[in-house]
């Protein structure tokens, strides 16, 4: 296909435009008349198509030059597709098997063709439906640890890390969205904000809490300045597809170099929002068991993260940070240094979790966990619990010492009625 001028794909044009790509034809066959093409994208930014035949299946994702959720009044650079591709390449190396296999990439057309994940289901859909996912915590905890460690100055050669950091600074439009929608706009009456009727008293509490807003902005300072590792940038339950045997992480177009705790914090917040939304999705006879399982997933994810991070610390610490020449080679333990790093990561996880819990209820793009609750009175009550716990996490990110304290806090807030 020509790559001279960008043109959005359609169901009608996709086969002709991609039909000459050998790597695609190897999977779905040369006979384009037998390709079944459907548009399946339900996200905020991109076109997504499935291409199926008797031979095989693929996913084709194309960036649009604007935010699909809003329209062409909010332009976005097509280069985000390039950064998504680059993140996927690095994640595939740092945690093999954790992301979809890339079949084809066209930078000018902003197209990525990938393996179709079957019979995988979006994690958020499973959480809303009350489905249990075996091995979820282990797989995602290890993913966060491996990508955080192996993308950092603990592991990479400093020249490679610095050049990669410089390249990803070009993803500034997507970083700008995070800086605005996540860290800033929930805390004032921004133009595109919206929230459920009945939440006004809670919103007033949050937006008048100067100490909390300062803590949120301090986390934004870290987001903009601390290029610790290559982050997925948007690791929510809609960015994970899974079966009981396999978990794949998708959609890293918000990739950037930032705090090591960013991805784990985003993921944790999404588990907490799933937890607080459950009373609207479950019958009373299954509610407690499923909510407890979600909290167990949070605890086990963090345990898996710490265990894997410690393992990599001992086996792959070859970068400029905390070198063995300063510790083990002199007969000194590096355990104190490791614990300091993990404590630093944990504080960021807690703060980011609270901020994202606010963003997903007050800013532009909300979570289906709450949005699919048709009873707005019920929804606002559950969202209020979520918002008030988010406030607690932001304010106390340095005093909540471990994940057990966090999950116990969730149990407490789950019993409160703030409206």
Question: Model-predicted segments: where are they?
Answer:
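A glycine-centered beta->alpha junction motif in the catalytic cores
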Residues: 63-70, 114-130, 149, 273-281, ...
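Active-site acidic catalytic loop and adjacent metal/ATP-binding pocket
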Residues: 38-53, 59-60, 214-264
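Conserved NTP-binding catalytic cores of kinases and kinase-like/nucleotidyltransferase enzymes
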Residues: 1-110, 244, 404-419
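ATP-dependent phospho-/nucleotidyl transfer catalytic cores
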Residues: 121-232, 243
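Active-site activation/catalytic loop segments of kinase-like enzymes and analogous catalytic loops
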Residues: 86, 261-331, 353-370
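Extended charged low-complexity segments that act as oligomerization/scaffolding linkers
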Residues: 109-112, 131-134, 302-307, 329-348
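Conserved ATP-binding subdomain of kinase catalytic cores across diverse folds
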Residues: 52-57, 62-174, 314-318
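Regulatory N- and C-terminal appendages and interdomain linkers associated
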Residues: 1-39, 155, 327-419
